[in-house]
């Protein structure tokens, strides 16, 4: 195998649709990766897939990971691949590239661990942090607002709570205001709920359980931060949030809290189409599957459009399979091209090829 000239092997490799299994067969073929015509495309695909092993392999063979203005780092931040972000940063990629794009896209997509990593490795809270807060707010990411706000060195109320007001439509959640509160009585129980400290809730329950406004606020906070144990405790103690309001189950769907969605549904909260749209908008596959099984006559085109626009490939695959309508593939492909979502573009391209091959086969038979 080693006796064939490079030129012959390169021609063979370029003819293969996926040459990588062969390339890793020995050191000789691995050394040819640098000569691949499509190495840039392959590298970006591996980053989009979260394949750290191949990112390391191609880098070890001389690939410039900062190619196209640190595009690989931007992609990793977008899709939440923390280990790839760490690797690229450790090997020279610039996390401040393009006016803090990495922090902005991670905040937009709700990747809290990447936001934390970026701040821990050079970002500082400043006036420049307001756009980050606004981006997180516009996309309903409570936990990022909380984290970034508490970085403010001028905040004298480090032990206070951040209260948020939000709005919800039939597929989106956004935060319209966020501010500190420092009422000692309320702040203690609000903060305890925010951080999931159920023991304080239990000890102080009799003090506030008769105050409907406070109880409702605590219930909302428990849902926002995913504290199912507090939600269960409040139900057990007789607290009842109005069933006609779907606000809380909408928040749970938007945050991806499947256990809370199930529990609220069990307690009488309705499952409606808008919940599916919200779960799809924020990329929560397990919640999407749970809701879909409990709905009838779902408007699949609507939710597929939402998930394409927001670049959640696995959910797109799930719904396209359920829809099973080849006539819509080109429409969806155009939408994916419009938003520049390469993973979804490749998926619909492959579906078109399969459809054309099936038609050709039927004609021949």
UniProtKB/Swiss-Prot annotation:
This is Putative ankyrin repeat protein R903. Pfam families: Ank_2, Ank_4. It comes from Acanthamoeba polyphaga mimivirus (APMV). Signal peptide: none annotated. SMART domains: ANK. Keywords: ANK repeat, Repeat. The keyword Repeat applies. Coiled coil: none annotated. InterPro entries: Ankyrin_rpt, Ankyrin_rpt-contain_sf.
